[in-house]
Amino acid sequence: MSLASLPLEKLTKVADVDKRETIYIDLLNYEKQLRNLNKNTREDSLQTNLNPLLSLIKKYGNFIAYPTRKLLSNCIIALLKGLEGYHQHRVLLYFVDSIHEKKDYIEIINVLSVLTSCLEEYGNQINQQETFIRFFFKYSKTNLSYGVRSIALDGLSKCIETSIQSTNEDLIKEIWKCIKSNLNTSSTNVLLSALRCAYYILGSSRLRNSELEWFKSFLFKKSSIDNSLLHSSLGRCFSALASAQADKSIEAAANAVPSTPADDENNEEVENRSTTRRFDETESFRHALRILVENYHSKHAKYESSKAVLVFAVKHLFLMQRPSFVSLNYTTIVDIILLHQSHSTSKEWLSSLEQYHCTYLFRDVIGRRFLDQSSELQGIEILLKRVLEPYLKDQSKISEIAVKTAMASTADILSRSKGSATALYSQLLDTTLQILYLGKDSLKNEVAWLLRCLLSVMPSPLMPTLLALFNRLELEFKHLRSKPKEVSPKLNVGIFNNLTLSLMSIYVAAEENPLYVASSIFSKLFNFSLDLIKSSSKLDLLAAQAQIKTGWRLLSAYVSFGPSFTRMQLSQLLILWKNALSRVPSKIHSQNFMETNADMFNRFEALQCLLSFLEYNKILFTPDVRKRVIIFLNNCLKFYKAFSLTKRLEITMPIPASDYSHLELRSLLLARIFQCFFELSQLSGMSLDDQELLSTTVSTIAELSSLQGYDTADEIVQAKAFTSPRVIPGIGSRFYAQPEEEFQTTMDDILPCYICESSSDSLSVISRSNSAKLPYVPPSLTSLIDNAIQLFASMFCHQPPKVMESTLEIMVASVTNLKSGRDILRYKAVTANTLFSIYGFLSAFDNKKVTLPDKVVSLMIELLENLTAVNDPKLIPYISKSYAFLAYLYQSKPTSVLDTIIKRAAESGDPNCRAVLILAVGHILKKVGSGVPQTTLITAYQLLKVFNTDSNDLVRECSIRASSVSLGSIAKTIPSVLTAQTRILLSYMLLPECDIDVQLLKKRNSLFFPSTLFANYLDCLINELGPNLRSDSSTSHFAFDLAHQLLLLSRDTGDNIIHVYKCYQHLYLFTPLETNSDFFIRELCGNIIDLKQPKRREISIEVLYQILLQNHEFSESCYKRHFDRLIWQSLDTTPDNKLLKNILYIWLNDYKDSDIHSWVNILLFLVGIKNTSSSERSNEQDIQNNLDEDTVSLAYGTSENASNPLFQKNYRWQTQFYAATCLKTCISEVMAENKEPAKYLISRISDLVRAAFVLSTSDNFYLKQGGFELLDTIITDFSNVMDPDFDDVSLLDQFQAQISSAFSSAFVDDSSPEIVAMSLNIASNFIGTGLLKTESQAAKILNLLKEALESSLPERAGFEENRHFKYDSKYFLRIATLSAWASLLVHSANVSYLKEFLSSNIRRLSSHWIMALRGYSRLQFGPSLVKDFVADTSFTRVQSINPKILLNIYEKSWLNIAESLTILLSTDANLIYGILSGDELSLSEEDVFFQDNINYASNRYSFNFFLFSVCFQSLLIPSTLQGFRNPVFRIMRIMTEVLTEELCTKVLYDHNVFPEVVDLLVRLILTEDWETKASIVIFVKKLALANPAHNDLKFCETDSVTSMEPTVSESVEMLFQLVKILTLALTVRVPGLRSDPAESATNKKASEFVILCFNAFLDVSNIFPAIVRVDLFATAMHVYEVIMDDQQLLKNSKQELLAALRKLLSTMVEQNDHTCTTLIYTLFEHLLNIYKETINDSDKKEKNETAFMSMVLVLTLAAPILDSEQLVVHDFLEELFSSLKSSEEDFALRTRCVTSLMLVNSKHPSMSALCRFIIYKSVTMLQNGEVLKSGDYVTEFIPALLDMHVHIPEEKKKSFLSMSIPIAAHFSILVEHADARKRIGEKLLKIMAIQPDEAKAIIQQLSPRQKKCVEEILIQNVE
């Protein structure tokens, strides 16, 4: 029996400095050994395995580091796994006893750590834990050190968690007293541990009310401390406290006894009961939530951190419930949180924070984690009924916070549940519009965003809603303008803001859903906006400003639609901007303040529109437009700087008709100027070098000029409600951003520094963000600073050196002056802003690869030195990276910066300075890399090694981070650095300075193990080792071990584990699946289904996906563990996650063939087919994969479907849609391969059709779409499959009714245009399959198509009123209908009744087809593309069509239309040209995009060229092919059909066109499938044969290529290009023709393709002049020989290959020159060698037969030019007759070949020797009995011999008869069959009829026997 071994003896020989590493490695091995022992072995050797661990703690405790302590605990856990509870209890008692009365704190810590970890793992299995509780309690006293108390309290919390109910009251009191004393500690570690204990005690509800009240006050007190980990713990405790108070309250109410602190003191016996009542779960939850909400609004929660902690507590309370419980109690949650909100009109931060928190809870917590598809709709209904509608009735009862929250939550739910419109949505729309009309300014953004989300989901009311809002806005302005001038109107800003923003927002929805509106609605927007701005000049100030604001904002929405809308209005827009952004008026200083404010307000609104124009119309920026915009912006900048601030009262007053005060608007104006300049700088070829603008940015950044006008810092913070008081005034937002290497924590979400200030940015509502949230808008002051920094970084690169120097000097002076001042906050803001600016422009310099002058570098170093003095860890990464950029850009002296930094780092005594500099060293090494000399590199490496063990935490961590980032650069110069680097990393992990428990013994207050730092180091190391890990198994295994331990440490410390996951990801990239990877796999998949930790879940999904891509073994292991079920569940919770979909697709692609049953059943179930058979894979796989119980239960559930989570819910429509997509893919790919899985799909056809029917009849748009796509796939792939039970019946025949009904469902009133269009095309394809045999069977579908055609034609009166053909959808559906009818014409070739059905409409259809195809060509390829068109005009018919809509449907329909026109062109060309020459096209709306003056009657090839060019250009744009099946194949057929000699002559063989055609064909021949390749070959052949110089080429007589005429030579060159395409096509399939002879596809289509190519090659070769043709013949012969090596091809297409050889030989014989004869002899010789080599090789039988038949063909077809005296011919004949002796299988073939050769060659005198040899050899072998089947041979030989008489010259016929008749007479006796004898008789009679005398004389000379035989044959023939 193998036992685990932990050798401690060798530690005595190990030096102390190495003992830590040795112990750790030994424990790693020991843990593996323990894990591999079975349960019985571990139980029998329990004490034996335990003793070494006890000894290790006792003897070598001082060498046990923090990670070792955790590893030691894991050893105990592995030892105890699976053992009974009493064994585990007994073992743990050993550790308790081992430190009895011990004073050594190190040993105590080690034992406490082991016990804590073991109780965490096995606490639920150990019944009696009082001993452990008292043990931990003993070491929790406040008289002990922080380290001991922290671990002891952690252990105590584990015990309390599992055994609190069985612990007596006295002990609980003592524990609580101890906890209270520890709660007042100054150590964060101890405080967190004490809070964990308190949390579990509170869960037992065994504390008195007075204690609960004390604890609440304590929590409020501590919540003001700025520590995110502490906040999380406080939040959990608040949640537990509220639950305990709720239980107390419920119990007191049930007992009808008031519960007060005084009563508690007097009735302790009553309170201290040993049993706990069970309370109603809902009631307890309701009370607890109410308590938390009351605490949130209480006076104690006066800090933002206190409120954030309470929000976290509410969130924790939710997370502790079941998801279904929270959704069921959604009404209660709404009532408690929202309906009890107080009315607040304050603009303070806490008020905004309260709004933020409510929205966070409802949208981000409840909405994203607890609501499924059904409860989401219920949630909308509850919010509507309990918040929005009541608010509409009485605004005093519902707070605006509640309304905003309800709207934000509803918008979020709508964005996820899009796809189906319900009656509830209509009710919601009406309510929202009514709230809008209330004119509440504070609700404007939420209302606008909700309307946008709602109308995106339910687009049908878009048009009426837009018109209603326009009418209301016009009415409001009319009312405003109608007031008398003497009456000062009181402007309701809210109604105008609401209407304006809502219109802007809804227009975005209209642009995204253009089929539901008329194009004229967009023109209405522009014209209305233009009128408002123009007419404002005639109004009073208030009304004018209201109109200006609305006009510019609506124009901002208009220009955001892009160039297709903006281009034609650009001139008017530029005039508007010129007027609004004019030069600074000369009398600006004499203007009153109101006039100045009005001017500034006008400029601000115009700038917002300009910014929108810059963002969405970059393509329109010509040099002239750029110049104008720069002038506009410079005017605004000068205006901003032209006046100074005046009276305090004036600058803080709100500006009329605006949302801002003067100070706010001033900041926003400058911010917009910066934003516009920055957008301008991003244009290609644009550089800004305006020094005045640069100085303005510097003033804003380094002098904080934006704060001018504010008296105090407090006033700055309080001026806006969107910035936290924690934020330093004037500092950039990047200062508070999360570092790149860290992930945002939960508290970062709850306690933001900034809140979205959407009211300051009207552009936010037109953002094209895919997020459901209203886009984040930073507060105005913050936005100004950020924009200034961004613009400065972009501009500084383009400045001359002198300007750079002066600017840097200003910055240096600014930082230096503030350094010695007392304004610390201002100093910090300026230094941070300056640093971010430096970092930004250095990054820009780096991207541009520009060097820096010496003076600039020295100033930069001086500035960075000043910034280094700022003691803030947040700035360290930016400073160090700035140094790296600087070193890289200072290329004249690349190492001078590094040398300076190394020297300063070594000499500096300031820890912060050392940390910055050492990290800078790492980044410089990474950036400069090989540019650093080796000596400097070694110095830097040695310095890093020293600093990696520094006693200062900050320095050490920065140094280790520097080591990790520079590891790659160092290793390239010093490869030996990587040797044993894993051990070096381990040594850093085991440093005494990293042992947080021991460090806490030294009274340090707060320490946490930096597991993320070491994980990052390990990840860098793995990437550097790379493929070497495959060969170095020890290093790879050790890396796996370190990753596993770091994962455990990250879980313990709560660190971000992304880097640990990345370690695993990269390990699996370079190494095979580790045997001990189960823990990591379970960890990943547990995170994936855990919605309570969304960020960790997101990371886990990404890492899992990357590993699956890189490691197939890992992927297979996960799939066998049934993790696809988990992924489906996880996908249903976040259905838009692309990575989850990709994971499923990977598995579907890999296992759809081997596991087709499971996949089909799961996919069918997901799409709603519930009664499918079991979809579970065999449980035997679980046994084979050694899955533990936890993994199987996690992924697999039980074996019964009823208990499997996968089968217990209704899935979201997004999940169903993706499942339908997967099912469609599965069907298409499986049926294409026609393998065994296809038979299974055939057996499930009824379920597949039912799934398609269920989806296509759904009320959800996307499910309808998925259903029709699935139905189309089924029709396409199963239409040719016959029913297995009835061979003459199609498989789909029985489903005709279901399929037809699905089409009918698309035409209901609420169907969308897209669905109608899709159903029309699929219906036409269904008819085209021929499944509907008669017109009566197809009547239902044909009627639908006919109705659609009649409704869509423009000449039909009243088509506008059709329920589907209205607004712009009428054009969309018209093209879709034409496409469907075009498909009918294409299918009419196979479906007879369609010809008659089409005949009555064919002319009308043809004209519309031509219009549509011409319109498509103009839009897609014309000189003016879509971006050139105006999508919305108002005056002409031409401009009433939105080209985006047309192009969208054209791209899905044009190919069908092109096919139909091609068919008509070939069958009834006069019809097409008659239409083209008539006036039928002139009045059509579709044809407005195509105007020409071509006379098609006289230039008929022109329309061919039109069709050809449309197809050709479409092949160059992949997007035009996506909507079709086999698009390239169909296009090539069209191009081949329309190809004429005239088209080739005038167009295709043009010098400019031909190369493009060839390039495209080369690309396609390499990438398309075999069928498409074949169509390309046919096209190439036809193109070659249509060469204009065809006749001149073939009959060109020349001895040299160089002597050809130029036209002929040019044509030869072009033809060679086509021949190259054919050769390339052959190389794709024939391995022997390419340098890499890899195997190619061997299916029948591929074989047919080779034959087609070879035949085309021969046909094209025959066009060339003779001198070239011969070379091509040689090439063809070589190709033929290579093809013969392909056994599979010969098996499929041998006869076709021989036919091709026949064609080649015939052509060569026809040419009849010496070279051709030589080539034929060479070929014959090669064939003979092949025949001899393969004659005994059974594997090459096909090749042998082909070679034999080829030689026969050569001797047969080339006989006129061959000489039979050649030795090679004689050798072949010998082989032929040799085969007659033994080849029984091929005897008949060989015999026929002999007779054929004899007959054919008898015609040619040069081959007479061959005939003589055949006769001689035949007679000899027959006489000797050597022929295997002599009777059969004679039956063929004698008639052939007698037939030769006809071809024998007259002078030799007598001698021939003298030979042939005796031979016939002698051997005819062997002929047994009467028919054969009769045939011989016929031949003899024919001879006797020609030469009777000679024949009779010869017969008389025969022997009696021979004579008798001849007579019998003749008599038999006569009879």
UniProtKB/Swiss-Prot annotation:
Coiled-coil ranges from the UniProt annotation: none
Residues modified as Phosphothreonine: 48
Compartment(s) where it occurs, according to its Swiss-Prot or TrEMBL record: Cytoplasm; Cytoplasmic vesicle; Nucleus; Golgi apparatus
GO cellular component: cytosol; endocytic vesicle; Golgi apparatus; nucleus
Repeat positions for HEAT: 106-145, 166-204, 378-416, 457-497, 783-820, 854-892, 894-930, 935-972, 1265-1301, 1336-1378, 1526-1552, 1553-1589, 1674-1714, 1722-1760, 1767-1806, 1832-1869
Alphabetic keyword roster: Cytoplasm, Cytoplasmic vesicle, Endocytosis, Golgi apparatus, Nucleus, Phosphoprotein, Repeat
Observed phenotype of the null mutant: Defective in endocytosis. Displays substantially delayed constriction of the actomyosin ring and dissociation of type 2 myosin and septum materials at the end of cytokinesis.
Taxonomic superkingdom: Eukaryota
Modified residues (Phosphoserine): 45
Role according to the record: Required for endocytosis. Also involved in cytokinesis and cell division.
Name of the protein described by the UniProt record: Pof6 interactor protein 1
Source species of the chain: Schizosaccharomyces pombe (strain 972 / ATCC 24843)
Biological classification of the source: Eukaryota, Fungi, Dikarya, Ascomycota, Taphrinomycotina
Gene of this entry: sip1
